C-alpha cells in the first residue's frame, strides 16, 4: 500500500498523460482545493502559467498552508476572464476522510474484479482514498479507475 506517499504533491502514474504540461488539474491539487474550500475552474487553471501550476502541485497541505493557498488563488484568479475562483466550505468528513469504505468505491472495485477490504482502505493515504472516491463517483467517466485501483492497491 502507499500510505507513506506525500499526499500534498504526489501525482499518480495514471495521470502521466498530462503531468508536465499540466493541461488538467491533478488529483493532488484537487484534494488541496477541496481542503481549502476553493472552486477552481479548468479555465482558471489553464490561464495560470506553467510555473504557477507547478507551484500549486508543490504547495504543502498543512492547515496554515491551505489558508495561504486559498488567499493565493483568490489573488491569482481575481483578474482572470472567469473572475475570482469561488469560495466553498472546506471539506470535512468526506468519504475519503473516513475509516469506512464508501459503498460507491466498494461497488466499483467489485464490478472490476478488484478485492478491496476495509483493512486495505484504512491503510491507504488520504490522497489514494480521495482519488478512488473521485474516480468512482457516479457521473464520472471512470476512465482511469482501473489504473487507479492497480496503482494504489500494490
Where are these regions (language model features)?
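Acidic (E/D-rich), amphipathic helical modules within compact regulatory domains
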Residues: 40-87
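A structural feature that tracks compact, well-ordered secondary-structure segments
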Residues: 41-48, 56-59, 117-137
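Short, solvent-exposed interaction modules
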Residues: 34, 74-127
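The feature marks the first
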Residues: 2-53
Amino acid at each position: 500500500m502507499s500510505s507513506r506517499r506525500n499526499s500534498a504533491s504526489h501525482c499518480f502514474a495514471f495521470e502521466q498523460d498530462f503531468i508536465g504540461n499540466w493541461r488538467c488539474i491533478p488529483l493532488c491539487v484537487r484534494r488541496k482545493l477541496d481542503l481549502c474550500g476553493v472552486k477552481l475552474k479548468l479555465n482558471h487553471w489553464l490561464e495560470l502559467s506553467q510555473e504557477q501550476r507547478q507551484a500549486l502541485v508543490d504547495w504543502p497541505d498543512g492547515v496554515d498552508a491551505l489558508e495561504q493557498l486559498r488567499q493565493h488563488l483568490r489573488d491569482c484568479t481575481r483578474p482572470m476572464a472567469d473572475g475570482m475562483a469561488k469560495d466553498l466550505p472546506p471539506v470535512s468528513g468526506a468519504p475519503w476522510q473516513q475509516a469506512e469504505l464508501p459503498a460507491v468505491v466498494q461497488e466499483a472495485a467489485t464490478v472490476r474484479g478488484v478485492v478491496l477490504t476495509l483493512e486495505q482502505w484504512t491503510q491507504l493515504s488520504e490522497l489514494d482514498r480521495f482519488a478512488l472516491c473521485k474516480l468512482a463517483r457516479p457521473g464520472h467517466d471512470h476512465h482511469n479507475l482501473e489504473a487507479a485501483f492497480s496503482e494504489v492497491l500494490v
